[in-house]
């Protein structure tokens, strides 16, 4: 009975563990299906998962999207992960030891993944020249529906764009945290 909060929480815990295992074993389709299950269960839950659990989720989704050559959502997942880490660091009152180095690495991943999204790809292109609806009919409505599902899977209201991802990275001060070489690459 998923109406019982304890049962729902046990299902969520199981699915998060299943996602971790699927990524560890490189079972990418299973990982994606599990992520969809997690999204559905989180929507049913009255309480949101804790920050570290969601951070792990976004990290795993970044890996899943990278394997699928979905550069746009790979970058978006890293953006969500960076947002969680920087918010946690701000709540801790600034730069905690060891955390700043981790945030620098993550800022680099955010900026690089956003820059790696092909220019002019918009929201339809994903990677290897395929459209986002490569696994089905290429009608615009289905493509938008699939993009909307992918966006909601990682907690976005609308599908991301390359320009939007870069803007978000800059507005979250990722450029200040990356190495001078990466700053130069951006400029």
What kind of region is each of these model predictions?
Residues 1-187:
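Extended alpha-helical scaffold regions
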């Amino acid at each position: 009975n998923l109406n019982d909060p304890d049962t729902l929480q046990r299902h969520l815990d199981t699915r998060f563990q299943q996602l971790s295992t699927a990524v560890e074993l490189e079972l990418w389709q299973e990982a994606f299906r599990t992520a969809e299950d997690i999204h559905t269960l989180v929507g049913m839950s009255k309480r949101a998962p804790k920050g570290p659990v969601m951070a792990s989720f976004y990290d795993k989704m970044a890996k899943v999207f990278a394997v699928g050559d979905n550069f746009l959502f790979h970058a978006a997942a890293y953006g969500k992960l960076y947002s969680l880490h920087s918010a946690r660091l701000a709540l801790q009152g600034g730069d905690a030891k060891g955390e700043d180095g981790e945030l620098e690495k993550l800022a680099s991943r955010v900026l690089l993944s956003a820059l790696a999204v092909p220019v002019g790809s918009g929201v339809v292109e994903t990677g290897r020249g395929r459209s986002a609806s490569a696994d089905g009919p290429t009608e615009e409505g289905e493509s938008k529906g699939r993009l909307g599902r992918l966006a909601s899977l990682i907690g976005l209201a609308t599908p991301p764009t390359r320009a939007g991802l870069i803007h978000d990275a800059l507005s979250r001060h990722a450029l200040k945290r990356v190495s001078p070489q990466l700053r130069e690459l951006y400029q």
